[in-house]
Regions:
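Short, hydrophobic/amphipathic alpha-helical patches that form generic packing surfaces
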Residues: 106-107, 132-136, 140, 176-179, ...
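Active-site scaffold of zinc-dependent metalloenzymes
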Residues: 58-99
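A metal-dependent hydrolase signature that marks the N-terminal structural subdomain at the beginning
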Residues: 1-75, 200, 208-209, 213-234
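Pan-zinc metallopeptidase signature
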Residues: 154-234
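Alpha-helix boundary/N-cap detector
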Residues: 1, 14, 18-32, 96, ...
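Helix N-cap / beta->alpha transition motif
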Residues: 51, 87-91, 201-203
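Active-site recognition of the HExxH zinc-binding catalytic motif
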Residues: 103-116
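Post-HExxH zinc-binding segment in Zn-dependent metallohydrolases
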Residues: 117, 123-165
Length: 234
């Protein structure tokens, strides 16, 4: 159940009734987004759940430069099995516009594909950690699969290119989250940007078995993305 953590937080009285009801009411937008991405890509969306807090990252010393992370792609080893989980923050579900929610879900899906690509090539260990938000945005942009190679859905592609010209900023949404969530002292999780970088041991990497068909699909998408990038350059 993708809402299990939210339900637990509500039962404990951490999330108030009105906020909880709003998230439940708007959750079908997330379900619609996941279905849309699966249809547009022909690939199943990874496990996703709603995190009942706002996730805030600051790069450390310059603590004034903080960013709200509306969703994160998290690799986990669970009972010797590797799984990628998409964490969607509750404030995104509560206050995001439909197009924004779908764009962020699609963006995390591209992260997921990128992660699987790296695992298949075994090049996860040397991934650099970038300490400032701008660098992270830049690293993000240079590595992700081209959305046009992955999704056959023009509206979805428009959402992605509008929302992520060079990293995601949605000031209206951020203002809402600050006003209705952070200022009301609702749950907040602080993460350092370093913890957003994936670290898996060589041993756990060697245990991961990918479905050969899925791996071939990833290779095809990588090839297609490369072609689109070349076109952009010339």
């Amino acid at each position: 159940d993708p809402l299990i953590r939210l339900k637990e937080a509500h039962l404990k009285g951490i999330i108030p009734d009105d906020t909880y009801d709003l998230i439940l009411k708007r959750f079908p937008i997330v379900v619609g987004g996941v279905n849309r991405i699966e249809k547009a890509s022909g690939i199943q969306y990874p496990v996703a759940y709603v995190e009942p807090s706002v996730v805030v990252s600051s790069p450390g010393l310059n603590s004034y430069e903080f960013g709200i992370l509306f969703a994160r792609t998290i690799p986990v080893m669970f009972e010797e099995r590797f799984q990628v989980v998409i964490q969607i923050s509750a404030p995104l579900v509560a206050y995001g516009l439909k197009g924004t929610i779908h764009a962020i879900l699609a963006h995390e899906f591209l992260h997921y594909l990128e992660l699987i690509r790296k695992i298949s090539k075994m090049d996860l260990l040397s991934d650099e950690i970038s300490g400032n938000l701008f660098e992270n945005v830049y690293a993000d942009e240079t590595r992700l699969f081209e959305s046009r190679a992955v999704f056959k859905d023009r509206t979805l592609l428009n959402h992605i290119t509008k929302k992520f010209p060079s990293g995601f900023r949605d000031y209206k949404l951020e203002d809402k989250v600050i006003k209705y969530w952070i200022d009301k002292n609702l749950p907040k999780t602080n993460v350092s940007l370093d913890s957003n970088t994936v670290k898996l041991s060589m041993e756990s990497l060697s245990k991961i078995r990918l479905d050969p068909q899925f791996q071939k699909r990833i290779d095809d998408l990588e090839h297609k993305s490369g072609k689109i990038r070349k076109k952009k350059l010339y």
